[in-house]
A protein has these predicted regions:
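A conserved ligand/cofactor-binding region detector
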Residues: 1-803
Length: 803
């Protein structure tokens, strides 16, 4: 890779950019102006390389990967792009020479508001790895104006605020209005015969213009550049000047406002018809624009669609982009004149599906009437796909109950996961356990009929970002022990650290690195939230999307128990213990919001109890996001991965903690199973029911009261929910939810969890043993690198060569 700048040439480029774009010079520029100048200078370099990459891809007729995801949780881009381009040291020095503090400038950049949780972060990691591995790839999503939301905690409760990330973030975007695509909703279908072919046209539809805003993505140690194409929504109709002249200003701009609503926010609330309609519009808008763009570029290169599947593979990240299947069929038949069989043959060899959940409520289903009204032609095609699929299923199984389960359209609903399975060349889960559950339970009949479609690709993380970039102290240790920077392209080189697991000097250095990271995070937390953290305390962390199956509430129950023990015996805790939470709840998820309120109520109670001072602390970090995780991961010592076994598809936070030397307290769920495969019992703190045991317990009749009646400590803990804490709020609703149904088996695992936490705290006191375990975790984390996962996709699903 050619390094684009020296420190001096970078200084000159920044000064020139400030003058040309902002009419100022370094001595007068604001931090915001300098931040944008940095982004624009790096964007220029990447854009030039992107042009060269596209030219080579077209000339050599390389097969291309198209990665569709409703989320791309990119985080901040300046430091990442400078790192990948090999100019991070030069950028820091240049900024210093120009009178700016690089650290302050990096902190000023907002996270790109394009995602919510693990789904979007995975997509971002994979895009980085695809680029680093020199795979011609494009990511596709929506250019959300406000993204998810900015979380504010007010009186202990979550309040959602708009997250306007584009102020600075727009500097990374390259608008391409000349490549805009028209997307049609509603309308009336008219059929006619011409030249022996049936033609179908959609008349009187509402048209929205999808305008691409491209974010260029640099890979590590390569001149290869890929693109994240984000679709912005625009009206095709200008403001009605006649209405405007009459003073009807809102009505004059109605079409414009309705169109732009599509790209306003990620996951609009869908517990009403308008919300469902907007979500479906978002999904079709993003899919239709993407497919049109892919097809247009393919035709420019090859002049035919007959070889589409040979030169393109479309990976759909969960069911949100599932409409890509009927949309491809629509274009192949209605616009390219193919017959059904030819169009289906190409489509079903072009699309691959990654499943990310076993939760039934997350396997999307759309009301048939809504699809029929909004997308009349797509609905016709779905009907025919469903009819042919049902015929195939009936001929294979001869069982009406199986036909019902596998149906794409049934009971007035369109089942998107079944559509993906029917129309995809591949179906993969994201951990070994998850993929087995898909084959044995969720899609067991599909697996029986078409076993060759099903495979596993365990998730991975961008180890360059989540170790080297955010944890320079640990990066230095790895380089010293594992052969320099070789591990950045060959993450399995981390395994070399295993040889030092009993080296006292290495373990002492590892301990010092963790201590410094804790001090650094404590300073960050004080400045950001005004909270005081004791670096001597155990940093026990659970940060992830708030959902009942992830069992933040189980963590809370253990903390309440610990608090009650401390009230009984102030000497029962000798080592300070800080529990750190970070989580956003979906705006309409009332129970999740109540759990956030509970965490903050408990934190407030403990902080005002003098018996807890210097012994027990609970901190909820508001607005958890990628940039906050980057501060927290290096300082974390205990990683809480405690989902109900069989419910978490994989998880990637568990991998990030592991890579930074935190020890896992967890169930055998998701990728924890594969972590256990490489770590063994001795290097993590496992507890609780296994997936098959949990399923059996539920099937045979789970009665929470049986566990309560045999455990006085549990009963006392639960009663605390009813009583509430110093803010006077009762959590009777959560109490009743646990004792009456406890869907995610918190009480069944409560005692084992408390025991696991006790084992962890005891082990923590033996620093040599703890650091020995920590080093093994780091050494064996290389298998969870995104480079490995992307290489598996490339070899086993996409059939594309890679570096």
């Amino acid at each position: 890779m050619t390094v684009p700048f020296t420190t001096q040439s970078l200084q000159d480029a920044l000064a020139a950019k400030l003058a040309l774009n902002f009419g100022t010079e370094p001595g007068e520029a604001t931090d915001q102006e300098m931040l944008k100048a940095c982004a624009l200078v790096l964007r220029d370099v990447m854009a030039l390389r992107g042009v060269q990459t596209a030219k080579e891809t077209k000339k050599e007729q390389k097969k291309q990967v198209h990665y569709l995801s409703l989320e791309f949780l990119m985080g901040r881009s300046l430091m990442k792009n400078a790192y990948n381009l090999g100019v991070l040291p030069e950028l820091k020095e240049a900024l210093g020479n120009l009178g700016f503090k690089s650290g302050d400038l990096f902190e000023l950049e907002p996270d790109a508001g394009l995602g919510n949780g693990g789904l979007g972060r995975l997509a971002a990691c994979y895009l980085d790895s695809m680029t680093t591995l020199d795979i011609p790839a494009t990511g596709y999503s929506i250019c959300y104006e406000l993204g998810i939301f900015k979380q504010k905690i007010v009186e202990g409760q979550q309040v959602e605020l708009p997250d306007d990330w584009k102020g600075v973030g727009s500097a990374w975007l390259l608008p391409k209005p000349d490549e805009a695509q028209a997307v049609h909703f509603g309308g009336t279908l008219r059929e006619f015969w011409h030249d022996g072919h049936l033609h179908i046209v959609n008349e009187n539809s509402t048209t929205v213009l999808a305008v691409p805003c491209d974010m260029v993505v640099a890979g590590y140690d390569t001149d290869h550049v890929n693109t994240l194409r984000l679709w912005d929504a625009r009206s095709t109709r200008p403001v009605d000047m006649a209405l405007f002249s009459r003073g009807e200003y809102l009505k004059a701009s109605e079409d414009e406002a309705m169109a732009e609503t599509i790209a306003k926010v990620l996951y609009p609330e869908d517990n009403h018809y308008e919300g469902k309609s907007l979500r479906l519009k978002q999904q079709y808008f993003f899919v239709s624009a993407t497919v049109q763009s892919i097809v247009t570029k393919h035709l420019e290169t090859y002049g035919t669609l007959k070889n589409f599947h040979e030169k393109n593979v479309i990976q759909i990240n969960d069911t949100h982009p599932a409409l890509v299947i009927p949309e491809l069929m629509r274009i192949f038949m209605d616009e390219a004149g193919m017959n059904w069989d030819e169009a289906w043959d190409i489509t079903s060899r072009s699309v691959a599906y990654t499943n990310h959940t076993v939760l039934s409520e997350a396997l999307e289903r759309w009301p048939q009437q809504l699809v029929e009204t909004l997308l009349p032609r797509v609905w016709q095609i779905i009907q025919e796909i469903a009819r042919r699929w049902q015929e195939k299923v009936e001929n294979f199984f001869h069982d009406p109950s199986v036909t019902e389960k596998m149906a794409i359209v049934w009971g007035g609903e369109v089942r998107m996961a079944n559509l993906c399975v029917a129309g995809g060349l591949s179906v993969n889960g994201v951990s070994g356990l998850h993929s087995e559950i898909l084959k044995k339970d969720v899609f067991k009949n599909s697996y029986a009929m078409e076993p060759w479609k099903f495979t596993n690709v365990t998730n991975g993380i961008d180890h360059r970002r989540w170790l080297s970039e955010i944890n320079p102290g640990l990066d230095g240790l790895v380089r010293d022990l594992a052969g320099g920077d070789d591990y950045l392209l060959h993450p399995q080189a981390l395994k070399k650290l295993d040889a030092y697991a009993d080296d006292a000097a290495v373990l002492k250095r590892l301990d010092e690195i963790k201590w410094q990271n804790k001090v650094k995070f404590a300073d960050y937390a004080r400045k950001a939230q005004g909270v005081t953290l004791d670096p001597n305390a155990i940093f026990d962390v659970q940060v992830k999307r708030l959902h009942e199956y992830k069992r933040q509430l189980l963590n809370v129950l253990h903390i309440i128990t610990l608090y009650q023990q401390l009230q009984d015996d102030p000497n029962c805790i000798t080592r300070p213990h800080t529990f750190l939470f970070g989580a956003k709840a979906a705006p309409g998820y009332a129970v999740a919001k109540r759990i956030i309120h509970l965490i903050n109520s408990l934190a407030d109670d403990i902080s005002h109890d003098p018996r807890c001072r210097g012994k027990l602390q609970v901190v909820f970090r508001e607005n958890y996001r990628v940039s906050l995780a980057e501060h927290l991961m290096p300082a974390s010592e205990v990683s809480q991965q405690i989902s109900t076994a069989g419910k978490e598809a994989s998880g990637t936070g568990n991998m990030k903690f592991m890579m930074n030397g935190a020890l896992t307290v967890g169930t055998l769920d998701g990728a924890n199973v594969e972590m256990h495969d490489v770590l063994g019992d001795e290097n993590m703190f496992l507890f609780g029911l296994h997936a098959d045991q949990a399923a059996t317990l539920k099937r045979e009749g789970y009665v929470p009261q049986r566990y309560i009646s045999h455990d006085p400590q549990m009963e006392r803990c639960l009663n605390a929910l009813r009583k509430g804490f110093r803010d006077g709020v009762s959590y009777e609703d959560l109490y009743q939810r646990l004792i009456s149904q406890d869907e995610y088996l918190l009480l069944a695992d409560y005692r084992a969890y408390c025991d696991a936490e006790r084992r962890m705290a005891e082990t923590y006191e033996n620093r040599e043993t703890w650091n020995h375990m920590s080093l093994h975790n780091i050494a064996r984390s290389g298998i969870f690198a995104a480079d490995r996962a992307v290489a598996e996709y490339a070899d086993n699903i996409w059939d594309v060569p890679h570096r």
